[in-house]
């Protein structure tokens, strides 16, 4: 049975280290509670997996009533991630979700490295009804963010979503760029962004953990958005990310449509692994 459970977890991209850690915890509980029934063992495993996903807690300032941003300014959400993860699409989906909640949204197209990202956001903006603030390709991302923050203030927006470039292979440039963006945000919001959300592609397996660690060295990640869960991927890598970095999952993306973004449910996610 233990081999079967190990195969299940590793097959779901949970990773060897996290798999062994979780199964070790389960074995200790099984021995302590003298459990013999296989279904009970699975139930304990599910409990341990859910607990891992909740270790990150509520790091951001906008997801609980007690830590909501002041009502006199927009909430600021910085979205980071490598190109190809569905980052820009996720920004549009978030804009759609906030619009459906009746919020006024301004999006900063600060991924000025890719012309496609700017045009993609402009197109999405028309579809979901969000205001897009964009400059030309190659423009200063900090200037885009400043203009977006100013526009949000003048238009009484509720939320500012900031799309950023994801060039991890040029780590110094990335650090410089994200550092500058944070400084621009802090000119308007001294405490910095309310949320820093990292978008990860569920199909990339262990590479997603490498990306998460790299971004966490550059900027304080407070949340994850897991994309491309509509394919064969089980997305088990989030257990390793949550376990090793203590970052909670906020959303999962399951398709290309604006509505294909749902709040993350730890119990449902764990149950899906066993189906």
Q: Residue locations for each model-derived region?
A:
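Primarily NTPase-proximal linker/entry elements flanking Walker-type ATP/GTP-binding cores
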Residues: 1-110, 117-162
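Short beta-strand segments
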Residues: 80-81, 163, 199, 253
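Short glycine-rich anion-binding loops that position phosphate/pyrophosphate groups of nucleotides
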Residues: 165-167
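Conserved catalytic-core segment of NTP-binding enzymes
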Residues: 118-123, 137-155, 169-275
């Amino acid at each position: 049975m233990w081999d079967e459970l190990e195969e299940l977890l590793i097959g779901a991209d949970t990773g060897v280290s996290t798999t062994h850690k979780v199964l070790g915890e389960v074995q200790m509980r099984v021995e302590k509670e003298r459990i013999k029934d296989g279904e009970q063992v699975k139930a304990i495993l599910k409990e341990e997996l859910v607990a891992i996903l909740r270790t990150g807690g509520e790091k951001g300032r906008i997801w609980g009533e007690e830590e909501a941003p002041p009502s006199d300014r927009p909430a600021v959400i910085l979205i980071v991630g490598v190109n190809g993860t569905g980052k820009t699409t996720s920004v549009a989906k978030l804009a759609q979700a906030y619009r459906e909640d009746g919020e006024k949204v301004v999006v900063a197209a600060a991924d000025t490295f890719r012309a496609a990202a700017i045009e993609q956001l402009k197109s999405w903006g028309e579809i979901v009804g969000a205001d897009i603030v964009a400059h030309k390709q190659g423009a200063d991302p900090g200037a885009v963010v400043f203009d977006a923050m100013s526009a949000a203030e003048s238009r009484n927006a509720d939320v500012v979503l900031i799309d950023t470039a994801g060039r991890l292979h040029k780590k110094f440039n990335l650090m410089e760029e994200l550092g500058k963006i944070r400084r621009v945000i802090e000119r308007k919001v001294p405490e910095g962004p309310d949320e820093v959300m990292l978008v990860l592609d569920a199909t990339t397996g262990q590479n997603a953990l490498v990306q998460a660690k790299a971004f966490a060295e550059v900027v304080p990640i407070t949340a994850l958005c897991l994309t491309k869960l509509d394919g064969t991927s089980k997305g088990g890598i989030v257990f390793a990310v949550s376990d090793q970095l203590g970052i909670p999952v906020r959303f999962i993306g399951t398709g290309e449509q604006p509505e294909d973004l749902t709040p993350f449910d730890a119990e449902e996610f764990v149950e899906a692994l066993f189906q």
